[in-house]
Amino acid sequence: MVSEFCKVAGSKASHPSGVCHDVAMANEPGEGCIHVVIEIPRGSRNKYEIDHDTGRVFLDRRLFTATTYPADYGFIPNTLGGDGDPLDALVLLEDPVYPGVWVEARPVGVLYMHDEAGEDAKILCVPPREPRWENVHDLDDLTPQLVAEIQHFFEVYKALEPGKTSSTGGLAGREAAWDEIRKARGNYKGPAH
C-alpha cells in the first residue's frame, strides 16, 4: 500500500520525515551510490507527488507542455535542497519504474536550476550494476545529446503554466553532484521532536 510505503511528512515550511527519511536501511547503497525514491516515471507527462501528510502518491498535474520526463525522477531521502524539499534526482534507467520505488543510483553530475521556489538542483544518476552504464562515472561520460535533452526539458517543462518558472544554470560533474548531496544532507535535520 503506497500510503504505508512512502510517507513523507513536512513541507517547505518544515522538513521531510517518515519512512522515506530517518530510517535505518536494511539494504544500504553500495560505495559511491545513493538511494533515490522515484516519484515520476520516464516518459510521463503526469507529475506525481508523494503527499507530505498522508504518504499517498497523487497526480499533482499533467505537464502543460508537450514534453515528457527524460528519466525517472524522484528525490534523495534524508536531504533538504535549496527549495525546501528533498534534493531532486534523475535516474537514467532503460525502463521506467513506478512511483514509490527505491532505486540504487550512482551520481554522475548535477544540473543547476532555479524555479519559483528558489534553488532547485537536479542530481543526474545511473544504475550502478547495469552493463549499459558501467562506463559512466562522470557527466562527460554521458552523450552530449542526452545531456542536451535533459537540460532542454527543464528549461521548457513549466513554460505554459501560469505562475511557474524554471531556468537552468549550467551543469557540473560527479564531484559537484556529491557536494550538492553533502550540502543537502547537512541541511536535513531529521524529524521535529
Regions found by a protein language model. Give the residues of each.
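Hydrophobic N-terminal alpha-helices or hydrophobic patches in metabolic proteins across all domains
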Residues: 16-193
